[in-house]
């Protein structure tokens, strides 16, 4: 395993051939059975957005695929019989899936090794909590209260496949790997026309790697230029020095602004800046003038258009003034709230009052959008009035109840950090009454008669799971009081928003 890892280590003096272990089975066997790369899983999870796709990866299937490739020589593809070739036909989607997944596994290794080397000597045991979605909000509470403006940026996707190939070319210098990579991309587009109407069965590992490499390239350039605006001779981002014609591209990019580069650096210089990215969006918080925040806005527009050749409209970059506007981020509406405090001070026989203003980040639930989502899924109407879920009446009573309890628990779990619980209680009320109406419709009864027959024990099911969790976190005296329902609670075990959507 050390030999394989040593082969994959980045070395500027030679070209990396990523396809070598793809065509030599002994290296595939090492990848399939050796657990030496398991120590990189934590590092890889930091590099990738979602690590849940590893559950669908089968090393045995990959081994059998490699054997069939050797026996049938399927990689020799005549261009005349491109559509008739069984490797590229409708029945060969499985082969493409596994080859693309295997290619992503191989290409991920050097990136994980290099990223893991940057974390040497640092403790990563607490990184699991940092992967939680809720871990972002305590950071925002601590930082955004001291800033004036927030730049909300929607990260664009490349509209042409060659942009993805060129992005990967900056880091992978092996021509054969890039040609194979381009082949996989274009074949995916050909198959997409046939399989777009069906449920997608493509493994997302390959495309998650593409997305993360695309975002990594954008962020590395942004941080590099950001560092140069504060420290002109900084060389902390050594990963950028291995690119092809990097300085030529940067020099061309800077001409977009003006020739007077020191003046631009002086205008963009801002030591008080914070950057957060999640789910295809990023926010840039700063404490400065509107002129500077507008310059950052057009910096992002020119970065995407000039460097990545992606048409990027300026309306995709929103400037929010926290004291006036709401920042919509990860399902919450955040804004700054001024809390006046009056302090009475006494010195000897004289007493006086001191007026203080405390700035606090207010996180609210977007009740309108949530009611719209519930109405779209037929839990209520557009006004928020609960209705019965007609499509669930064929299920058993316990199944219906468990579904509603799980949905209510997930929503309560995620929006426990809201500063105002009134909207959360309204959502719970909609789900509870929808559950009762669904059960009453199944038994062909009215809601009043159904509740009278079963009693109040039915609605207690919605409170059991959440109360058990909170009772383990807080002391009994604090839990028994009503203060618990007025505080914000951030959980550090919410890793995916899909868990809330799929109710798993």
Swiss-Prot record:
Chief location: plastid
InterPro entries attached to this UniProt entry: Domain_X (IPR024937), Maturase_MatK (IPR002866), Maturase_MatK_N (IPR024942)
Coiled-coil intervals: none
Record bears the keyword Chloroplast: yes
GO molecular function, one term: RNA binding
GO cellular component: chloroplast
Source organism, top-level taxon: Eukaryota
Keyword tRNA processing: yes
Keyword list, A-Z: Chloroplast, mRNA processing, Plastid, RNA-binding, tRNA processing
GO biological process, one term: tRNA processing
Protein localization: Plastid, Chloroplast
The family this protein is said to belong to: Belongs to the intron maturase 2 family. MatK subfamily.
HAMAP family: MatK
Functional summary from the UniProt entry: Usually encoded in the trnK tRNA gene intron. Probably assists in splicing its own and other chloroplast group II introns.
Protein name: Maturase K
Organism: Crucihimalaya wallichii (Rock-cress)
Taxonomic path: Eukaryota, Viridiplantae, Streptophyta, Embryophyta, Tracheophyta
């Amino acid at each position: 395993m050390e030999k394989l890892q040593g082969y994959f280590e980045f070395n500027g003096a030679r070209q990396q051939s990523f396809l070598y272990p793809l065509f030599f089975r002994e290296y595939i066997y090492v990848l399939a059975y050796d657990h030496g790369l398991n120590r990189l899983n934590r590092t890889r999870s930091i590099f990738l957005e979602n690590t849940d796709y590893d559950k669908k990866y089968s090393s045995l299937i990959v081994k059998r695929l490699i054997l069939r490739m050797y026996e049938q020589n399927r990689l020799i593809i005549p261009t005349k019989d491109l559509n008739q070739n069984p490797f590229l036909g409708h029945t060969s989607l499985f082969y493409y899936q596994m080859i693309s997944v295997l290619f992503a596994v191989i290409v991920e290794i050097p990136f994980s090794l290099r990223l893991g080397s940057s974390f040497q000597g640092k403790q990563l045991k607490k990184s699991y909590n940092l992967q939680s979605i809720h871990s972002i909000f305590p950071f925002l509470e601590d930082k955004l209260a001291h800033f004036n403006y927030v730049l909300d940026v929607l990260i664009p996707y490349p509209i042409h496949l060659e942009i993805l190939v060129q992005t990967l070319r900056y880091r992978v210098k092996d021509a054969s790997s890039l040609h194979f990579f381009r082949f996989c991309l274009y074949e995916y587009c050909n198959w997409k026309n046939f399989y777009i109407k069906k449920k997608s069965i493509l493994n997302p590992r390959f495309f998650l790697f593409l997305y993360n490499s695309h975002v990594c390239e954008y962020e590395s350039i942004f941080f590099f230029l950001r560092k140069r605006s504060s420290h002109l001779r900084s060389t902390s981002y050594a990963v950028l020095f291995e690119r092809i014609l990097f300085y030529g591209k940067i020099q061309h990019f800077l001409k977009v602004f003006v020739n007077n580069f020191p003046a631009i650096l002086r205008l963009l210089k801002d030591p008080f800046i914070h950057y957060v990215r999640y789910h295809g969006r990023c926010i840039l918080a700063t404490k400065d003038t509107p002129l500077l925040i507008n310059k950052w806005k057009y910096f992002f527009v020119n970065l995407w258009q000039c460097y990545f050749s992606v048409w990027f409209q300026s309306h995709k970059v929103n400037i929010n003034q926290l004291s006036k506007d709401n920042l919509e981020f990860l399902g919450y509406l955040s804004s700054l709230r001024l809390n006046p405090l009056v302090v009475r001070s006494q010195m000897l026989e004289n007493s006086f009052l001191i007026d203080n203003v405390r700035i606090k980040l207010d996180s609210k639930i977007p009740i309108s959008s949530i009611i719209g989502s519930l109405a779209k899924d037929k839990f209520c109407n557009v006004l928020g009035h609960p209705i019965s879920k007609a499509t669930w009446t064929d299920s058993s009573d316990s199944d219906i109840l468990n579904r509603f309890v799980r949905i209510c628990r997930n929503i309560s779990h995620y929006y426990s950090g809201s500063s105002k619980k009134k909207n959360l209680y309204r959502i719970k009320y909609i789900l509870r009454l929808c559950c009762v109406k669904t059960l009453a419709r199944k038994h062909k009864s009215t809601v009043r008669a159904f509740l009278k027959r079963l009693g109040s024990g039915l609605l207690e099911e919605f409170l059991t799971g959440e109360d058990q969790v909170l009772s383990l976190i807080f002391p009994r005296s604090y839990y028994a009081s009503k203060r618990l329902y007025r505080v914000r609670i951030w959980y550090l075990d919410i890793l995916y928003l899909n868990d809330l959507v799929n109710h798993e």
